[in-house]
């Protein structure tokens, strides 16, 4: 890259001028001394993160992999629990666990949680678990599941949490690829009042493992009502028998070198097999703590409500670990926002005096389908801020939550990250001092994340208004340092994903930067449409559709067209006050052209009741495109409702296949 281009790229990456001066100065510290910035970040967290031994070296790069805080000794469980108890926080509530389906509420304090985790740790040792062993956890949200994660971390075992409800095939893939020899599961779960036979799904999964896998034990969390659970002698054990194994064992923590693994978390890939991202004790701990402080303003006085599940990275980072590192109270909610009532989340917020909320655009749009009336029945005045991630928070959903539900009294802040990044990489720093919110934009790279928007063909740093792809140019402490068991895929999928992005972490998102430095996402890079030579993001068209009062949710994908190369096809979920009709379809098409101009060409719009989404709430546009173009659907193990696929099929029959 020529010098003037490098200078321009640095200038474009500078933090937005709309940030307060002290925040801009903080951002620039990372630009000027990257390693020094992250060393100071770790040192500044000394009252919440404990080091048994300070690191010898801040950063070590062995492309494409890397290490942080080399030679340091820590343990995230010790920092989260033992250290907090030593600081006098033992009597404070650590977790409040609630089930929407059963109505059960349980609270555990820091000292109670520490004692519970010690017992789990001793029992794990009692069944033969050693440092470095992988433990699959297949349990619904709750204190037992979070406690098992912490117990694994405590003894140096590596937890592999699998979303409770994943299919046997998906479980088997994750157990096999991680090399887990143990599964901890619950006998049964429930969702919207329907029972889920979790243990039976685990049994099916274990039958699919290849010969020689060496699986050892399944531990089953059961209740007195679970009388008919199939158990395999010598392999399976009930919860009481598991806890009895703690006898004669100790629940002491292990001092972990900074770069020893903490957990593995599978993430979706373009192939049938998931990618197994990994995180280590030190870098992950520092990163999720700092982003919690800088972006969310997490602090010890918070009652924090993340609506995610521990099966996802948000659940790991901001249901379990970061809230405990900050010494606050975290609510673990098992269930949906609208079952058995449409005000379940609002009820949780009011009863617990929630101060901070982390949710997803899908969650907000789901609440919007019931209107603002359920919110009006509750006192939400304790809430100080809402942060949102998972997909782009479209302006209509932001406006509804910001203005209708919270009446402009608090900020609703969008931000962006991935499983592989463990925490925010793009976001408005609420904790440090915000710039104005621009609805539809996630704002700018977070402190200590050196990001750019480049042309994926030649790596050229792009200017204001030029569409390209988001890349990270330097590894940061929360970035996955490798893929478990597949370093070659790590190199090719992330650091050499495109001809122009070699040596850059390829996030896979299409984006552009505006004159104030705000980043606007257009969708996944492979979902950007090219209509008559115009590059148009699917998110842009979805935002236009959702800005119409009739539309609650929309999914858009490009489909082949002989004349224009591609045109847009859309499926929408309507507001309860509107009915499908040809007149409404035409009105929506006209509305999109009015919002976006004549360059956008819509082939058709299908009306459906639900979009195909992953269990973490992301719209599965690839499934829609595959259905439209008669392609293979691929891996559907993460889909929330299989019936949504049938809805798309029926809608396609009505509008005609492409």
Question: Where is each model-derived feature located?
Answer:
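N-lobe entry segment of adenylate-forming
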Residues: 1-108, 112-119, 125, 206, ...
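Conserved pre-ATP/AMP-binding loop-to-beta segment of ANL
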Residues: 91-93, 215-223, 231-266, 273, ...
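Structural core segment of the AMP-binding/adenylate-forming
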Residues: 150, 154-241, 353, 360-361
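Conserved AMP-binding/adenylation subdomain of ANL enzymes
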Residues: 283-303, 313-356, 369-370
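Gly/Ser/Thr-rich phosphate-binding loop
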Residues: 237, 321, 328, 355-359, ...
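Conserved AMP-binding/adenylate-forming core of the ANL superfamily
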Residues: 77-78, 91, 95-149, 167-172, ...
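AMP-binding/adenylate-forming catalytic core of the ANL superfamily
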Residues: 162-188, 202, 350, 357, ...
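Conserved ATP/PPi-binding loop(s) of AMP-dependent carboxylate-activating enzymes
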Residues: 444-448, 460-497, 536, 632-633
């Amino acid at each position: 890259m020529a010098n003037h281009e490098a200078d321009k790229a640095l200038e474009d990456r500078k933090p937005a001028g709309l940030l307060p001066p002290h925040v801009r100065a903080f951002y620039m510290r990372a630009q000027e001394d990257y390693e020094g910035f992250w060393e100071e970040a770790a040192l500044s967290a000394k009252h919440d993160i404990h080091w048994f031994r300070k690191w010898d070296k801040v950063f070590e790069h062995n492309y494409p992999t890397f290490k942080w805080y080399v030679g340091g000794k820590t343990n995230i469980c010790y920092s989260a629990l033992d250290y907090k108890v030593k600081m006098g926080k033992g009597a404070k509530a650590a977790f409040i666990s609630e089930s929407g389906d059963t109505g059960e509420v349980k609270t555990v304090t820091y000292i109670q949680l520490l004692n519970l985790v010690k017992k789990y740790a001793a029992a794990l040792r009692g069944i033969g678990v050693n440092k470095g062993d992988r433990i699959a956890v297949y349990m619904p949200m709750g204190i037992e599941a979070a406690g098992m994660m912490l117990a694994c971390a405590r003894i140096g075992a590596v937890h592999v949490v699998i979303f409770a409800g994943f299919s046997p095939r998906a479980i088997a893939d994750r157990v096999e690829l991680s090399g887990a020899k143990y599964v901890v599961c619950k006998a049964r779960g429930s969702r919207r009042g329907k029972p889920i036979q979790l243990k039976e799904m685990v049994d099916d999964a274990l039958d699919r493992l290849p010969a020689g896998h060496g699986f050892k034990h399944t531990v089953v969390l059961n209740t007195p009502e679970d009388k008919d659970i199939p158990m395999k002698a010598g392999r399976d054990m009930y919860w009481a028998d598991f806890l009895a194994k703690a006898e004669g064992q100790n629940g002491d923590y292990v001092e972990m070198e900074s770069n020893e693994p903490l957990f593995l978390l599978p993430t979706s890939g373009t192939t049938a097999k998931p990618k197994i991202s990994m995180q280590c004790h030190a870098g992950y701990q520092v990163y999720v703590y700092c982003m919690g402080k800088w972006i969310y303003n997490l602090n010890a006085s918070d009652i924090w409500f993340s609506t995610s599940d521990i099966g996802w990275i948000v659940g790991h980072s901001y249901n379990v670990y970061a809230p405990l590192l900050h010494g606050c109270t975290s609510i673990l909610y098992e269930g949906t926002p609208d079952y058995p009532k449409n005000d379940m989340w609002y009820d949780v917020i009011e009863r617990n005096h929630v101060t901070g909320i982390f949710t997803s655009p899908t969650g907000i749009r789901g609440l919007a389908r019931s209107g603002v009336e359920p919110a009006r029945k509750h006192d939400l005045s304790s809430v100080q801020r809402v942060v949102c991630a998972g997909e782009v928070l479209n302006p209509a959903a932001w406006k509804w939550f910001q203005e209708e539900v919270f009446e402009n009294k608090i900020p609703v802040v969008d931000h962006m990250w991935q499983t592989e990044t463990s925490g925010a990489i793009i976001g408005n720093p609420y904790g440090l001092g915000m710039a104005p919110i621009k609805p539809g934009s996630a704002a700018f790279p977070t402190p200590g994340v050196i990001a750019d928007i480049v042309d994926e063909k030649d790596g050229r740093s792009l200017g204001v208004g030029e569409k390209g792809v988001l890349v990270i140019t330097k590894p940061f402490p929360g970035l996955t340092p490798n893929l478990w068991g597949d370093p070659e895929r790590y190199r090719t999928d992330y650091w050499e994903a495109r001809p122009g992005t070699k040596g850059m972490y390829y996030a896979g998102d299409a984006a552009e930067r505006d004159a104030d430095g705000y980043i606007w996402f257009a969708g996944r890079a492979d979902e950007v449409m090219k209509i008559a030579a115009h590059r148009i993001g699917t998110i842009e068209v979805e935002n236009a559709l959702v800005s119409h009062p009739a539309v609650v949710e929309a999914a858009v994908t490009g489909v082949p067209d002989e004349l224009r190369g591609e045109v847009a096809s859309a499926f929408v979920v309507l507001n309860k006050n509107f009915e499908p009709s040809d007149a409404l379809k035409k009105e929506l098409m006209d509305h999109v052209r009015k919002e976006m101009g004549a360059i956008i060409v819509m082939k058709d719009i299908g009306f459906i009741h639900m979009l195909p989404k992953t269990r973490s709430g992301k719209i599965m546009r690839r499934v829609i495109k595959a259905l439209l173009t008669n392609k293979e659907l691929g891996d559907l193990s993460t889909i929330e409702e299989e019936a949504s696929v049938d809805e798309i099929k029926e809608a396609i029959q009505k509008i005609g296949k492409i």
